[in-house]
């Protein structure tokens, strides 16, 4: 599913913006148009909604694997605990302790930690690929809802628990937990919608289904402040004729007599007054490494 088709001449492409060409697949073009316009997820058909969610889950899955691999490579040959735990948030350790208690229900951890012989025996047991791999999978699934199965080579590494702690404190880890926990909740729909937008366009560009011209990155870097994905979406809407520089704002008296449904905040203001206080707090927690367990 992640195979690139950028260099495949048999894949027809259509211009979808001044800086973008997209493969001429009707379903992809239809979803891209809805994503670029920021339509509520409820406006997508069931087939489209399943595809968007599957892509988001797939990208979270691959992203967590890549991050854990990166941290494992960074920790190779390091034996200083102060260095290994430099990027590990404090709330990670109580969660890891509870996970270890469930993995070894009959083990006295207090005695094992302060006794060198028992500690060495416990370390040998943790180095077993099946045991450590299961520990990693359960920990990630418990906190993100994603059943990520990591390769045995990662699980066999002696510093894997420190690498897992760095992964736990990463923003992508919290974003995955936020996405899986609040998917389908109406109060969080505007925030989930923004995540789906970014993930969708990242998927199209990463797999070669959307080709971006090189000058787009130069223009975006000097004239745009909200990122390449928002830049491409605005270009997409401008090309399709759906981008308004001056969005219509009804008069307050008109707003009192017109309530077609639950309001949705603008794309550029996800934490507006349309969101519930709980949704705003959850969104702010995504930027706080010490609150990863609250997401």
From Swiss-Prot:
Pfam families: Herpes_UL79. Residues 245-261 have a biased composition (Basic residues). Keywords: Host nucleus. Belongs to the herpesviridae UL79 family. Plays a role in the expression of late transcripts bridging viral DNA replication and late gene expression during infection. Functions concordantly with UL87 to initiate transcription from over half of all active viral promoters in late infection, without affecting host transcription. Acts on and binds to viral early-late and late kinetic-class promoters. The gene is UL79. This is Protein UL79. Its main location: host cell. It is found in: Host nucleus. One of its GO terms (cellular component) is host cell viral assembly compartment. It comes from Human cytomegalovirus (strain Merlin). Residues 243-273 are annotated as: Disordered.
């Amino acid at each position: 599913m992640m195979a690139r088709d950028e260099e495949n001449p048999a894949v027809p492409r259509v211009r979808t913006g001044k800086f973008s060409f997209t493969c001429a697949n009707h379903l992809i073009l239809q979803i891209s148009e809805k994503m670029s316009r920021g339509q509520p997820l409820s406006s997508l058909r069931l087939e489209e909604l399943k595809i968007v969610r599957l892509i988001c889950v797939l990208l979270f899955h691959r992203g967590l694997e890549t991050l854990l691999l990166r941290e494992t490579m960074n920790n190779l040959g390091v034996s200083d605990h102060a260095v290994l735990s430099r990027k590990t948030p404090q709330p990670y350790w109580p969660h890891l302790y509870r996970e270890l208690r469930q993995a070894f229900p009959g083990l006295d951890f207090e005695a094992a930690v302060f006794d060198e012989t028992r500690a060495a025996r416990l370390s040998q047991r943790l180095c077993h690929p099946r045991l450590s791999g299961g520990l990693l999978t359960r920990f990630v699934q418990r906190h993100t809802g994603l059943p990520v199965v990591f390769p045995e080579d990662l699980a066999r590494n002696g510093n894997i628990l420190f690498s897992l702690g760095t992964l736990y404190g990463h923003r992508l880890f919290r974003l995955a937990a936020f996405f899986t926990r609040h998917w389908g909740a109406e109060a969080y729909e505007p925030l989930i919608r923004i995540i789906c937008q970014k993930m969708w366009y990242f998927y199209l560009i990463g797999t070669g289904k959307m080709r971006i011209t090189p000058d787009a990155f130069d223009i975006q870097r000097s004239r745009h402040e909200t990122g390449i994905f928002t830049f491409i979406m605005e270009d997409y809407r401008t090309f399709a004729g759906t981008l308004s520089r001056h969005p219509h704002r009804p008069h307050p008296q008109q707003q009192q007599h017109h309530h077609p449904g639950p309001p949705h905040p603008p794309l550029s203001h996800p934490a507006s007054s349309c969101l519930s206080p709980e949704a705003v707090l959850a969104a702010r927690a995504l930027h706080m490494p010490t609150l990863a367990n609250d997401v």
